[in-house]
Amino acid sequence: MATPSMMPQWAYMHIAGQDASEYLSPGLVQFARATDTYFSMGNKFRNPTVAPTHDVTTDRSQRLMLRFVPVDREDNTYSYKVRYTLAVGDNRVLDMASTFFDIRGVLDRGPSFKPYSGTAYNSLAPKGAPNTCQWKDSDSKMHTFGVAAMPGVTGKKIEADGLPIGIDSTSGTDTVIYADKTFQPEPQVGNASWVDANGTEEKYGGRALKDTTKMKPCYGSFAKPTNKEGGQANLKDSETAATTPNYDIDLAFFDNKNIAANYDPDIVMYTENVDLQTPDTHIVYKPGTEDTSSESNLGQQAMPNRPNYIGFRDNFIGLMYYNSTGNMGVLAGQASQLNAVVDLQDRNTELSYQLLLDSLGDRTRYFSMWNQAVDSYDPDVRIIENHGVEDELPNYCFPLNGVGFTDTYQGVKVKTDAVAGTSGTQWDKDDTTVSTANEIHGGNPFAMEINIQANLWRSFLYSNVALYLPDSYKYTPSNVTLPENKNTYDYMNGRVVPPSLVDTYVNIGARWSLDAMDNVNPFNHHRNAGLRYRSMLLGNGRYVPFHIQVPQKFFAVKNLLLLPGSYTYVWNFRKDVNMVLQSSLGNDLRVDGATISFTSINLYATFFPMAHNTASTLEAMLRNDTNDQSFNDYLSAANMLYPIPANATNIPISIPSRNWAAFRGWSFTRLKTKETPSLGSGFDPYFVYSGSIPYLDGTFYLNHTFKKVSIMFDSSVSWPGNDRLLSPNEFEIKRTVDGEGYNVAQCNMTKDWFLVQMLANYNIGYQGFYIPEGYKDRMYSFFRNFQPMSRQVVDEVNYTDYKAVTLPYQHNNSGFVGYLAPTMRQGEPYPANYPYPLIGTTAVKSVTQKKFLCDRTMWRIPFSSNFMSMGALTDLGQNLLYANSAHALDMTFEVDPMDEPTLLSLVFEVFDVVRVHQPHRGVIEAVYLRTPFSAGNATT
């Protein structure tokens, strides 16, 4: 047997252990050897000892992972704070990169959580069909409407006991069995076939809701069962627990209206009160203001509640405090009490981590352990490629018997004793061999046509685009009352939009995004696949006992090798549901009843599985200050937010004089104020939103709203020089009117800006344009997200017959769709009056519109710190002017106006590094260097 010391050195950093042959049964070893040529066992049966192979003195060193329990915890209203003592023993090195917080708690996603589209209850019912029900008229007379589906026993009458459903012959005499009113007749049972050819009159029974149960459409209706057979009737109030259940059920009998005497009921309805609920639907058409049962309320129409996925954010963004005053965290040696975590307001910890992951791997591959499922959107929703529908063939639906309505015929035959001299064949009744009741339909089978393709496309547009239009395009249905707070789920859910705003004929043939949708966050959508995945990881119920693992992201801590000593490690975890959780609708989860509580937060950590003498050698090396650990923040940037008031178009920015050495350039984008929390406070009471947070997770979508940016230093040097298409010191991003032909890619982006972006992201441009290599073209990069588009619209000026017909007066599909509402169709078939034809021989005069979208990325302007060499190029070259002097900076951004306050997020790409020194046991020191903003703030 091989001794452990004979194992090769590489086994130190691997799962080491005995060879399988040393501890498996001889028979299995023999089998493995015999089959090794075509079925290699490899290390499938390796001894699961995880440890160094020699010089091991304690079993503690052999453990792959250790659990640290907090020595102190503070559970406050808005946060949960944990304090650990990390004891790193001699000859060990703790790998902070392997640590994670193991968190258990309870999550209530609130009543606004709905993890599916449509309804789970009677989803096949027409939206406006009522349940079988009763109501009283103004004379207090009871009316009943609906279906009695269950046939009684043939030949047996309805008696006072109800509907006969069977005959018991076991005792020798036939005894009629009547329906058990507690659950029979069952709503799911009726005629098993369409065939009814025996000619006998059958009696029917059914169930109906009493008038005291308020009417709701069948679509979405649910009533809980009250007995194990599935009956749903409520118990009468007088019912006591000791007696047999007394259900609120009464029988109502009905006979044909034409009968005037000798009444004999044909129908019996078992009327009952039930606990009627609509868990996932709401009313969009309500004829009156009352909820009580009435004839008019038969016509109510339901719509499913909007889907609202709720889960933890990508990579648990927002759960741990970063970038916030006094709440950041502590990693301090107990000997020195110097905190290695320095608080800087304008760090980009979360965003930096997102971009780092993108550079390391494919973000479209989900990793459930760290909750890595990146926010995404369906590109077919953001930009609609409306190429019409392929509906060349008509689609029919047929009655169940394939015929339709029939007439009853009797048989006739040629008359044998025909009267002589009569022209034509004479006929006689044939009732000897032919039935007197023959059901025959003359002509083609009855059919109805439905354009399935067009309906699917129209439904897609309404569910995915129209319902996400800004609230100003929506209205509240008549007789429906919604909450005042527009951030609540009930308000967002109750608002409806005219389907004709986004119909199959809008922009038909074009690849175009609705202008109104361009500034709407496309990641706040039920087709956000990453959020949907993260929501479903937690399950499909409102209440979740969760158990999650959360890594540390702060760049100075996350990769640290912690040398022997005793350390204090403190961090805060948020309990603000709007920050910790993400919803696809972006509603205010605080108001809508979501809560989160933590029951335990433990820290799991790994020691490097090294032999003790190897670990001590590593420790000795790292104690030397020449081997200090240095970490660069991946983004290496100082982030500043500048407010842009509603409808403003110009934003001036001034940076005081400083030396711009080590400066790499600018990145910038635009954020909505509503979607950006105040990270400087532990709890932001004004953050009443739970959708994606571009500031933290990189879901930028307002880049297309920039027009120009000018950059001026306090010198006469033209920067970045006059060798570009446009004027120095100014970058024109898009131009609406392009007389010189400076635009590119069939959109309104300028060639100049396209060049700058290709150079900044891929160093492509001066050698000609080409598609960047795959490893450079990541999820957050420019080229992958650049979406140019164009369309033609009617030339309202030069087309003399143009009439500006507004939405209420436009008709298309009249008679086949609802009027300005997602309700029952109305109107008559008639020629459409909208839109004007842009093709064919009758095409009207048109103009071309162009635009682009570029989501997820940040605009970049690269910069060289010897920029002062970039003056006017002459025969003498470029003169060095102020190469190392300090300069003030003035920037002016020109943007499209938006009707809500926004923020300019300006990222100064700086040299951002931390150097961590651990000179003695239990001492940790950190120095943060940040140039040119060494103070950590771009305004100083």
From Swiss-Prot:
Any one GO MF annotation of this record: structural molecule activity
Keyword annotations: Acetylation, Capsid protein, Cytoplasmic inwards viral transport, Host nucleus, Host-virus interaction, Late protein, Microtubular inwards viral transport, Phosphoprotein, T=25 icosahedral capsid protein, Virion, Virus entry into host cell
One matching Pfam family: Adeno_hexon_C
Site feature Involved in interaction with pre-protein VI, where: G765
Signal sequence residues: none
Induction of its expression: Expressed in the late phase of the viral replicative cycle.
Sites of Phosphotyrosine modification: Y928
InterPro entries reported for this sequence: Adenovirus_Pll_hexon_C, Adenovirus_Pll_hexon_N, Adenovirus_Pll_hexon_sub2, Adenovirus_Pll_hexon_sub3, ADV_hexon, VP_dsDNA_II
Cross-referenced SUPFAM superfamilies: Group II dsDNA viruses VP
Similarity comment text for this entry: Belongs to the adenoviridae hexon protein family.
UniProt miscellaneous comment: All late proteins expressed from the major late promoter are produced by alternative splicing and alternative polyadenylation of the same gene giving rise to non-overlapping ORFs. A leader sequence is present in the N-terminus of all these mRNAs and is recognized by the viral shutoff protein to provide expression although conventional translation via ribosome scanning from the cap has been shut off in the host cell.
UniProt function note: Major capsid protein that self-associates to form 240 hexon trimers, each in the shape of a hexagon, building most of the pseudo T=25 capsid. Assembled into trimeric units with the help of the chaperone shutoff protein. Transported by pre-protein VI to the nucleus where it associates with other structural proteins to form an empty capsid. Might be involved, through its interaction with host dyneins, in the intracellular microtubule-dependent transport of incoming viral capsid to the nucleus.
Name of the protein: Hexon protein
Organism in which the protein naturally occurs: Human adenovirus B serotype 16
Lineage start: Viruses, Varidnaviria, Bamfordvirae, Preplasmiviricota, Tectiliviricetes
Gene name tied to this protein: L3
